[in-house]
């Protein structure tokens, strides 16, 4: 506990909030190159093969990013756009790849929430 005199001299210091997407360095998105594309299993009680990619960003930081949607065309050396947003059942995955930009194709046959998956409107 500081004395009144110490508080007069220094004052209280505000706590700084921890940044959840440090690798983006304050940007909404960052470009990167896939260094490895693979599947991993989620935490209990869920069971699946989640598609993830190891991405080297333009900030020269390597992160693990989730590939949302059904099916993808990503492979090593693909250019991707990465945004923040964690996947709750995959530890250490705090970024998501944006579908439909750069080398990433949109989800085919998607009818709802198309803008999230880079899917164009189907001709009726």
UniProtKB/Swiss-Prot annotation:
Start-end of Basic residues biased regions: 108-118
Gene that encodes it: rpsL
Membership in a protein family: Belongs to the universal ribosomal protein uS12 family.
Listed name of the protein: Small ribosomal subunit protein uS12
GO cellular component: small ribosomal subunit
NCBIfam families with a match to the protein in the record: rpsL_bact
List of residues that carry 3-methylthioaspartic acid: 89
Role of this protein: With S4 and S5 plays an important role in translational accuracy.
Top-level taxon of origin: Bacteria
Record note on quaternary structure: Part of the 30S ribosomal subunit. Contacts proteins S8 and S17. May interact with IF1 in the 30S initiation complex.
Gene3D superfamilies recorded: Nucleic acid-binding proteins
Signal peptide region: none
Pfam families: Ribosom_S12_S23
Annotated region (Disordered), positions in chain: 1-32, 104-124
GO terms under biological process: translation
InterPro entries: NA-bd_OB-fold (IPR012340), Ribosomal_uS12 (IPR006032), Ribosomal_uS12_bac (IPR005679)
Classification via HAMAP family: Ribosomal_uS12_B
Keywords: Methylation, Ribonucleoprotein, Ribosomal protein, RNA-binding, rRNA-binding, tRNA-binding
GO molecular function: rRNA binding; structural constituent of ribosome; tRNA binding
């Amino acid at each position: 506990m500081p004395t009144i005199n110490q508080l007069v001299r220094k004052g209280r210091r505000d706590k700084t909030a921890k940044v959840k997407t440090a690798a983006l360095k304050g940007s909404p998105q960052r470009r990167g190159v896939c260094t490895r594309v693979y599947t991993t299993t989620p935490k209990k009680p869920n069971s699946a093969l989640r598609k993830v990619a190891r991405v080297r960003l333009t900030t020269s930081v390597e992160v693990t990013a989730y590939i949302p949607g059904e099916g993808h065309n990503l492979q090593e050396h693909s250019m991707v756009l990465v945004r923040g947003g964690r996947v709750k059942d995959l530890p250490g995955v705090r970024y998501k790849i944006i579908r439909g930009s750069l080398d990433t194709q949109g989800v085919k046959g998607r009818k709802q929430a198309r803008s999230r998956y880079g899917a164009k409107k189907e001709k009726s």
